[in-house]
Swiss-Prot record:
EC number(s) per entry: 6.3.2.6
Biological classification of the source: Bacteria, Bacillati, Chloroflexota, Chloroflexia, Chloroflexales
GO molecular function, one term: phosphoribosylaminoimidazolesuccinocarboxamide synthase activity
SUPFAM superfamilies: SAICAR synthase-like (SSF56104)
Segments crossing the lipid bilayer: none
UniProt entry keywords in alphabetical sequence: ATP-binding, Ligase, Nucleotide-binding, Purine biosynthesis
Protein name per Swiss-Prot or TrEMBL: Phosphoribosylaminoimidazole-succinocarboxamide synthase
Biochemical pathway: Purine metabolism; IMP biosynthesis via de novo pathway; 5-amino-1-(5-phospho-D-ribosyl)imidazole-4-carboxamide from 5-amino-1-(5-phospho-D-ribosyl)imidazole-4-carboxylate: step 1/2
Entry's Gene Ontology BP terms: 'de novo' IMP biosynthetic process
First-tier enzyme category under EC: ligase
Gene that encodes the chain: purC
UniProt cross-references to InterPro entries, sorted A to Z: SAICAR_synt/ADE2_N, SAICAR_synthetase, SAICAR_synthetase_CS
Length: 250
């Protein structure tokens, strides 16, 4: 597919203008994988295609569930055509179980279950390690309106429970999930960016020792070719499993 000029580039993707439609953009999924705000980084051949396939599977599923997203189509595994948005510089994190940074902040929360899913906001700022930010601070800093904060909270929980139910059909526990939002040209708020295997914690059978997500890369003391091959295999399995959601949820 023909690509327009580069609009932006991040650690794991490049955003291109659409060659003929100014209301669309094209995401190119790179083969890079990073952790620690980019302090650890490697290239895994084929990872971008798996990320693109997973993102397409997830967004198609959300669209069919009636959730407004920027996803249009995935003409190639590494390319995603989306509605062009102005991104809100926030990570919106939903948690069913305490894990990761939440447990480091609140170790006493171990063993809890959040119902409804807990929603947290983090400012996208690598230099400051994506600090947590409150809804009041989001509004005070002009990042989003009170109505948008409420919509991101409600939609975030809806996205989580929708994907949680799909994963449950495959006996996989969705522990937590990170998403982003953007404003489309008409001002509407859309679930945007990507949702791939870097975006969540997923535990088959509820067992963290069987994790399929990026945490296995974060946890590795030393990253060698065997670790990267293991990461690739897990990402390939997730791309395949998310492709089965439609069949198992009918």
């Amino acid at each position: 597919m023909e690509l327009g000029h580069v609009l932006s580039e991040g650690k794991t993707k490049i955003v291109y203008a659409h060659p003929t439609d100014p209301d669309l953009a094209i995401l190119f999924h790179k083969d890079g994988i990073t952790a620690g705000d980019g302090a650890r980084r490697h290239v895994i051949a084929g990872k971008g295609a798996l990320a693109g396939q997973t993102t397409a599977n997830v967004f198609r599923f959300l669209n069919r569930a009636g959730i407004a997203t920027h996803f249009i189509e995935a003409p190639e595994p590494k390319l995603t055509v989306v509605r062009r948005c102005v991104m809100i510089p926030l990570e919106v994190v939903m948690r069913r179980l305490p894990a990761g940074s939440y447990l480091r902040r609140y170790p006493e929360a171990a063993g809890q279950r959040f119902d409804p899913p807990l929603v947290e906001f983090f400012l996208k700022d690598d230099a400051r390690h994506d600090p947590q930010i409150t809804p009041d601070e989001i509004v005070a800093q002009g990042i989003a309106t009170p109505a948008e904060v409420e919509q991101m909270t409600m939609t975030g929980q809806q996205v989580f429970t929708t994907l949680e139910a799909a994963w449950a059909k495959l006996d996989v526990t969705l522990v937590d999930l990170k998403i982003e939002f953007g404003r489309a040209g008409d001002g509407s708020l859309l679930v945007a960016d990507v949702i791939d295997n870097d975006s969540w914690r997923i535990w088959p059978g509820g067992d963290p020792n069987r994790m399929l997500d990026k945490q296995v890369y974060r946890n590795a003391q030393v990253v060698d070719e065997d670790v990267l091959a293991d990461v690739y295999a897990r990402y390939a399995q997730v791309a395949e499993l998310t492709g089965r959601w439609d069949a198992v949820t009918k």
